[in-house]
């Protein structure tokens, strides 16, 4: 079998695009990708490096992270790409220019995917998560912190919208950019703190440490520490 379009970054196949003609339901493209997985196309050799799947018709596009196994294909993790105001982009030309362009395609792969160690799956951010994390990181970078006139901000989330992943990715971007010495996840309930700590550690890379604080003394020591492993703190 032969796929339709493969995007390469530095010679490596990372985004597979499956196309269907106009008026054909986009689900046929996702089914085709799932069939390729069943046949082992993405399980061996160089195509095992594919990170993102894109199912596209001229009128509709879905994108999702490579789930690895056929049984892990779940439609609830197929996402439409939306603009900053959460309006679904349907025209394929906008998808190409907004999502599959350079440098956006590079950023999606490099910064806005998460290899979740808990369930051993790759996750990609929804568009609104991308815009939130990107905006927070950008404002943090551009702010003059010497003025002492900076204001706080918030991201409005509903239940099940992925706030844990959004907060982690925002913190990760800020910490890795060097724009902050410390990033603190402040939770208002012990149960939520334990749950979030577990999820954050699943999201973190091999070279990233998420620090827990059992009491005020430990929190103070982590805040004073200059160790890179103490940059991300949950309390």
For the regions a language model picked out, list residue spans one by one.
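ATP-dependent helicase/translocase motor core
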Residues: 1-182, 191, 195-207, 227-231
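Amphipathic alpha-helical transducer elements in NTP-driven molecular machines
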Residues: 26-30, 213-217, 234
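Conserved AMP-binding/adenylation subdomain of ANL enzymes
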Residues: 206-214
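Conserved motor-coupling elements within RecA-like helicase/translocase cores
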Residues: 216-233
